[in-house]
């Protein structure tokens, strides 16, 4: 989940914690965004890791008798040649900090975000989505030191509504991505953001989750991707059903960068 330390969230860490307590959660992990070189104006958003740890560290102590707070980060990996060196430098600075949990995500490709319509304009949607998976493959091979790959099929969320692309067309490259993730000892998340918005499937698609499990993948975290309080812990019951159907018996929580497994 994301707080005001993320450029796209307006909810304070305190509100996230209070909401989680009201909903009966015993533990949460705040994973604010660090997308280097994005937005394009570097003065618009700068992730201040010292302020982040100071704030969440105080809240962890303040709330310790009511809920466990783990401190995480979602780092945005990129493959564009003109920014890779900058990303590498920032990643090297952040990955060694005492986070409990680090999500490595691909949000951006070709200096654009699939969330925005202009990412797709002037491009053949299938080719664009394939290029995004190719960028994701580069990222999971190039970067190390993260715990799980976030919302693996992120770009598929935002394919234009008038376009239908069969997910099975991407299974070959997805299999290669999953193989790299498993071989490196990392995992996946099931991201319930789409479920919270009324869609029938999470990210990644259950087809991908089943493939991951069949290939021997075991590390699976559950994230709401909440940017607003109303989505804290949203659709975790549905996520449990999906994971069980995909063959999982346990979900994972990271503490001090170590995975702990809990029965679903």
What is each stretch, according to the model?
Residues 17, 21, 95, 140-142, ...:
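Non-catalytic positions within long, well-ordered alpha-helices that form the structural scaffold/packing
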Residues 1-2, 9, 13, 24, ...:
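Charged catalytic cores and adjacent phosphate/nucleic-acid-binding surfaces used
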Residues 42, 47-183:
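Extended substrate/RNA-proximal surfaces in nucleic-acid metabolism proteins
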Residues 1, 28-30, 69-73, 102-104, ...:
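Hydrophobic faces of well-ordered beta-strands that scaffold small-molecule active sites
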Residues 1-86, 158-160, 164-168, 192, ...:
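An N-terminally biased module of ancient metal coordination in phosphate/nucleic-acid-related enzymes
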């Amino acid at each position: 989940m994301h707080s005001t330390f993320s450029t796209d969230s307006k909810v304070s860490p305190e509100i996230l914690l209070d909401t989680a307590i009201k909903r009966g959660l015993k533990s949460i992990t705040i994973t604010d965004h660090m997308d280097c070189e994005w937005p394009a104006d570097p003065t618009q958003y700068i992730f201040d890791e010292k302020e982040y740890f100071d704030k969440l560290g105080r809240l962890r102590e303040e709330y310790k008798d009511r809920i466990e707070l783990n401190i995480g980060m979602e780092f945005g990996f990129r493959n564009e040649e003109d920014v890779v060196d900058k990303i590498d430098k920032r990643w090297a600075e952040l990955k060694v900090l005492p986070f409990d949990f680090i999500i490595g995500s691909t949000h951006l490709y070709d200096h654009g975000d699939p969330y925005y319509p202009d990412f797709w304009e002037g491009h053949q949607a299938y080719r664009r989505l394939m290029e995004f998976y190719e960028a994701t493959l580069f990222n999971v091979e190039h970067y190390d030191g993260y715990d799980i790959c976030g919302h693996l099929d992120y770009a598929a969320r935002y394919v234009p509504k008038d376009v239908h692309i069969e997910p099975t067309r991407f299974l070959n490259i997805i299999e290669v991505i999953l193989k790299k993730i498993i071989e490196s000892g990392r995992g996946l998340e099931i991201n319930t953001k789409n479920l919270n918005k009324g869609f029938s499937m999470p990210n990644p698609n259950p087809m991908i989750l089943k493939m991951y499990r069949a290939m021997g993948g075991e590390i699976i975290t559950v994230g709401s991707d909440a940017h607003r309080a109303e989505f804290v812990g949203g659709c975790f019951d549905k996520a449990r059903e999906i994971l069980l159907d995909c063959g999982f018996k346990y979900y994972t929580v990271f503490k001090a960068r170590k995975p702990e497994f809990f029965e679903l």
